[in-house]
């Protein structure tokens, strides 16, 4: 029930009912005053919490900004460069959000606290002062009235008239105070309807403006997020392949002789103990020694292992270099130490006695110094009986495999990724390459299933005595794709292909043509160019040196294969440009190191356009809008091209964006589309089975087990998303933009209903198919300009939306 009205006429009567109604208004004003005090207190606590949150976010952002990624190897892929730069981009995004929050905090006191305090003090305070005056005049008036009424009628007339005049004045003062008090109370009650509510509305306006800014920043962040997600997918894919190769190398190292000599710069190197003669005997000091048999240079570096203090670790002194004259094994009975030998050098008189770590290690040093024995290497990867050759039987086998796959298995899910049973593969290889087998042996489809044939084809290529792309050109191919110039990568690989021997080039043409056909059916078999690169990269470009450094280049081997597949027609049907300079490892390594992060995708820094306040109602999404996501176009699960951006010809003037993309870019509203395959855009592998090295087969799984594993794989569980993805490839860019799917190749699983996902990027929420097909247009939101500029040019944390990613 509302407050009773106060009539001015009742002020003259001053009835108990009037006083009761007046008391109701006073109680309400007192309650309002207490509420405003509490509200101001809570508001100050909220502002303090916002300041603390802002400080914490800025500290977190600074930590991201200060961290520096370092990768193994002398060069980084575009994916690694973008990932290394991502923390700085995240920091920039957080700083931009905090810039808006700081504006909210700075304005909160003026918008919320000050107006409320002013209303409480000036309006409610004035009403309290009016009450004090009213109470004072009431008491004074009724006191005078009682005295006046107590006068005796026998008093003189002049005295009575004076008393009447005095009471009339007091009554008028009382009436004036009562009228002013009633007027002020009613004024305050009416003023609080707007002066009390307006500060709260203004504060919420600023708060929703901040939220709306975050909403728009999320839209601008969407293309970068998608590109970075593709980079993460590709890096994970390469990691799985490289890890298996490195693990196999570790096993071979473990199974090798204890004192094997790995290929390296020196003929022999390792720790030796050197005898140093003293006046009271001799000491043995550990040195790290190297020997180069070509120049006969022997180097000793004194090393001392500190076990504590600030110098914990290996302390190296400047090396001593000598030219070897002779090396003689030390007789066992001439010294009480084992494994010793003597050397003579030009720079010193007398002999230097050295102690090796074992008998076999001494033998290696002795053989190296007189040059009589070859270097011991790791166990051979292939036995002689396993080697295959580029002969007529090999070419016929490859052609038969390709014909069989293209005739009956081109649409098989996980083609070439899912291996056959090892025993069947070995039986196939034995029957085809047996000494008495005919050169034109056919592959019976009833005998050999598709998985066995594809595994046999990979096994043949893997077991070549020399990899198909040769050891001689291996480093040249690697350095070609390490270039920052997208066009140069393609042109350099093109030129190097024509330096291959004729048989190698012919076989490579045969294989890449087939892989190009396989990739064109990736909508069904899910074997994108990137997946094929991961499988065939280590097979076609096996490194001659079995080292960890060589394993780190597997990711670049995959890129070479991607370039060959994507540019098959150009590379194998057109002559290379004779003016293209071939890669030089030294120059490319230096240039890459100097600008290692300059090519990273980023959210361009720049000033942003200031905007007026958005009506709070416009910041609230309606029931049909995307309430929980900044964009319905979550990251696509996989385009049908290469995941990596390395093999795309971004700088080629002959390639342009798709018409649908250009149409959206000209629309003037915020409309991001997935880059077309013609651009240097993200190209994702589809969600199939776990990435596997091309040189590994599962010897334990049968065909049925593989099919069962595939049926429960993430790719199968996400089949609604896959079908949606494949269907949208032929649709407009608007539909592509609305596609919702998951990102991770290996660990991102999509539940039934396509509502949730988890994996390497857990923060990217997958939406349902119904939501994913919903248009991004929201009628309640104002159109977004292509670029926004802020008046405050000093703020460098803002960013404008990037161009095509």
From Swiss-Prot:
Biased composition annotated in UniProt, kind: Basic and acidic residues: 694-704, 782-793
Residues the record marks as site: Arginine finger: 417
Ranges in a coiled coil: 225-262
Top-level taxon in the UniProt lineage: Eukaryota
Region (Disordered): 576-600, 625-725, 765-805
Signal peptide interval: none
Composition bias type Polar residues, residue spans: 670-693, 710-721
Keywords, in A-Z order: Coiled coil, GTPase activation
Tagged with keyword RNA-binding: no
PROSITE patterns: PH_DOMAIN (PS50003), RHOGAP (PS50238)
One cellular-component annotation, GO: cytoplasm
Rho-GAP domain: residues covered: 376-572
Gene Ontology biological process terms, A to Z: signal transduction
GO molecular function (one): GTPase activator activity
A Pfam family of this chain: PH
Job description of the protein: May influence blood pressure by functioning as a GTPase-activating protein in vascular smooth muscle.
Protein name: Rho GTPase-activating protein 42
